[in-house]
Amino acid sequence: MLARWLLVLLLLLPVSWCHQDRHGRRHYPRRWRSSGSRRELHEPLFPLENAPALPPPPPPPPAPFFPFLPDSAPPQLPPPVTTPAPAGGAGDGGTDAGAAATGDASSSSSSSASPHPTAPANISYMAMPIYHSAPLRSFLSSHRLLTVLLPVAAVLAAVLAAALVYLLTRRRRCSKGEPHAAHTKAVLLSPGNSTALYDGDHDQHGRGSTATAASSASSPELRPMPPLPRQFQQTRTSMPSTSQTIHEAGAEDKRAPPPQSVRPPPPPPPPPPPPPMPPRTDNASTQAAPAPPPPLPRAGNGSGWLPRRYTERAAPTVIRASAGAVHPEESPARASPEEKAADAAARPKLKPLHWDKVRPASSGRPTVWDQLKASSFRVNEEMIETLFVSNSTRRASKNGVKEANAACCNQENKVLDPKKSQNIAIMLRALDATKEEVCKALLDGQAESLGTELLETLLKMAPSREEEIKLKEFREDAVSKLGPAESFLKAVLAIPFAFKRVEAMLYIANFDSEVDYLKTSFKTLEAACEELRGSRLFHKILDAVLKTGNRMNTGTNRGNASAFKLDALLKLVDVKGADGKTTLLHFVIEEIVKSEGASILATGQTSNQGSAIADDFQCKKVGLRIVASLGGELGNVKKAAGMDSDTLASCVAKLSAGVSKISEALQLNQQLGSDDHCKRFRASIGEFLQKAEAEITAVQAQESLALSLVRETTEFFHGDSVKEEGHPLRIFMVVRDFLTVLDHVCKDVGRMNERTAIGSSLRLENAPVLARFNAVQPSSSEEESSSS
């Protein structure tokens, strides 16, 4: 490829030279042709014979001389130009003839010797300045630079090509001298050259070490290693390919000295044991430990051990050195690997602290870590193991418990649906009572000991008819094989009519709260009716709205009305005035505010204009406070608006139906017999039944009274339209919504009154003194007359 580029560059050189020659002939013709073959620039297109004599142009300055340029020449001085003397009148003809002859002669010579100046020459000298940088531009042109750069680029390309060829040749020579991987593998695996390879793992955090050695089987220092126990096996995360490892081993064997001079490298330290399994207390812990893995297969001749990855495609294991090769940091007097493994297995695995280990300083200078080695400070390892135990250990322990539970559950007999059984188990864990306490409370009828929430939970656990039959038919000797949900339900079903008892006890537990709610609701309805019918201010608002509406509806079918439905109160804010801000409700409230304020404050003749303004503002303020208090007067109306008549009626019906269920449970209990549990249940239920019947009768009477008052109140405001009401309590809802709108309008009216009062006070302060004197003068004159 590089040779092709060089050939292209060599072909481009003649082309560039030809282009340069053509460019030079076009732009620099004086170098390429002889003088006289072309008309000079200053020669005229036609001779000027009768042109008047003009003074000669000034001589051009000498061109600068550049001796270092190739085409430069020393400057030459122009020849002197002589001006001919003017001739007399007699000799005019001869002079003209001589001038014509001279002009004819000078047309073929240079323009510098012509006695007659030409227009183009004079114009060129006057309009165009003279530049002397043409030689320098010609020398530094792009074509010359291209001519110089192309050879330089060609030389550099040739040098690079030569270097590349040299490198390729050297690489081929080196590759020919090395043996192929297949031949190396054959040599290593041959019977005569069997090799013992030792592999291990050691990362930068000190978990192990890696050592690979390859030598002949005749070496006295190295011998085949047996397989290690299971806890010292460790899976390598990244394993090189088999061919690469054997190739490297063969290369090392080829460069290594004879076996007699080879000293084995120090064996790596043993890797840390795997995390121990948590102790188990169930039956699974009594099982025997798993057997160790089988030994590694031998080589073809059976003379040595090969790593596992050379014989089968499985995860390699870490093989330690023999017992004779002791790590320099270890001592033979220390504990055996089995004891260390047992000690490490008893310790739980902790969460890692990620840091970067620091190697000892190569300079030998003391560091802070050297001082800390002699420190007597010790940490509480038990607390560390408790606080920072690894999540994997926790999961392992939980998995062990789950496996034990699963093993037990596999032997359990499932009667309920799995999802229902799980839900019941969750409910049982949420209960604060045991199975025995629940059964005793159901037998005695003690609803207060269980509570409403627990009884509701029990009622949700009620099985279907088929599930109840299966649980009752289950043998008593096989109850231990049932799950927690099934065993609990079987114990509850052992009680006669258990879930009927639960329903009756739940009714008893909720009876008092239900009765109190109904009584309070009916009392609220009665109070709301009384407030709405007896509110003077509400009636005054209705009067103001009626009169305002009749005035606005004059001449229409809606005029001259004597009453209106209260729904029209909500439409007052939709009728806006001419300014687009004031609504009809604003107007009604302002009128009522003035009326209420005037009735509260005593009226009298004001002494001056300022006191009159103050009295008017105070009157509006007092009246607005009275109107805004209407929402507080009708508080029970707001509460009644939030009630639902259907809900109240259903609650009363449930109370009546619950009494019938209590009576049914009591009759079933009388059929059982007269044991202690039946007597206690009958006593508690019978006493409650008498009280419940009286309470229900009172609630039903209060319900009828409250609903009759509501109908009367609706008729009091709506007349015969009460029959058209779809909801009995709708009148309270309308009044509640109107009170909400009324509160907003009262706030707007209060802000408007404050702005009006401030503006009036400012106008009074800015009024002239004479106007204020005139305003005070009538009152003062009256005082004088009265005193006289």
Curated annotation (Swiss-Prot):
GO terms for molecular function: actin filament binding. Residues 53-83, 257-279 have a biased composition (Pro residues). The chain crosses the membrane at residues 148-168. Keywords: Membrane, Signal, Transmembrane, Transmembrane helix. One of its GO terms (cellular component) is cytoskeleton. One of its GO terms (biological process) is actin cytoskeleton organization. Its main location: membrane. Residues 340-768 form the FH2 domain. It is found in: Membrane. Residues 1-18 form the signal peptide. Pfam families: FH2. SMART domains: FH2. The keyword Transmembrane applies. Residues 231-246 have a biased composition (Polar residues). Residues 327-342 have a biased composition (Basic and acidic residues). Residues 97-118, 209-219 have a biased composition (Low complexity). Residues 48-118, 193-307, 322-347 are annotated as: Disordered. It is a single-pass membrane protein. PANTHER family: FORMIN-LIKE PROTEIN 15, FORMIN-RELATED. Belongs to the formin-like family. Class-I subfamily. This is Formin-like protein 15. The lineage of its organism: Eukaryota, Viridiplantae, Streptophyta, Embryophyta, Tracheophyta. The gene is FH15.
